[in-house]
Amino acid sequence: MLDAISAEALKFKRHRATWGLVWIWPIGLTLIWLIAIAVELSGVGGEAGGDGRGGLTAAGWIADNVGFWGVPGDTFGRYIIGAFVAVVFAGEYGWNTWKLIVPHRARTSLIAAKYAIAFILLAIGFTLAALLFNLFGWLTDVITGDSIPAGITAGALLKAHGAGALAALPAVLLTIAYVSLAAILTRSTVAALVIGLVVTTIEQLFRTFAPMIEPSAPSLVGALYEVLPGYHVANVASFATEGRVLEIPFPSGTFSTSLGTSLAITGAWIVALVGLTFWSFRRQDIN
């Protein structure tokens, strides 16, 4: 298993897909900040001297500066995650390398290694980007002269980063599960990406618009809202960042569930999709 993970790490840590879809977050943030601060200091964007954040409380400043953790769970962020996962899982088919690897290693360990390296690289990329986002927020205030609120501690920052990471985790894992299964079933990077984009978009759209369409089929819409993962992913994120249940107003009444229920349903979807991926690959004819 460790050999398989090492092989995947060697393959993907410098792969173009990793540079373009994982390392792009910290690199892109750095470039954007450098451009923004240059514009600010040059006075091109208006009079320099602060961005108006001086009146923030410590809690507000921390919330602003750990805000990058909203990106992995956002629709666009999930699209980028899906693109990377599609390359990791379907790339072997396009490169015709499975037939060279499969006879020498257990198929279960091969897929497990892909899950491990995809998650590890994404975790490193997003964590580095989130920490840089925090650092750049502080540097911006220092350079522009905005006051930094008193009472900000390392412990409070770490707690906020941890909550943000936990809030993003279900969406990231679910996206990995969607796209990995599509990659194994279709054997195509493009098809896996398209399926991942479509499923993620439908998930988000249904969560948003279900209250509007409920009157046309109340029982069906209500049942789907309870069992599909969209609401439950958002509910876990709400608990992680705000400490409260996510309440969705429907014409028939407010919909909400407990954290335990949302964790169970989200976990069941992830386990089922990942399990299907392992099962499908073990039965697949590799030519």
Q: Where are each of the predicted segments found?
A:
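Aromatic- and glycine-rich beta-strand/loop motifs that create alpha-glucan
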Residues: 1-26
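Helix-capping/transition residues at the boundaries of transmembrane alpha-helices
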Residues: 11, 90, 102, 179, ...
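Short loop-to-helix capping motifs
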Residues: 15-16, 105-106, 187-189
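Secretory targeting signals
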Residues: 18, 26-87, 112, 116-186, ...
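Transmembrane helix segments
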Residues: 31-41, 189-230
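Junction motif at the cytosolic side of a transmembrane helix
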Residues: 264-287
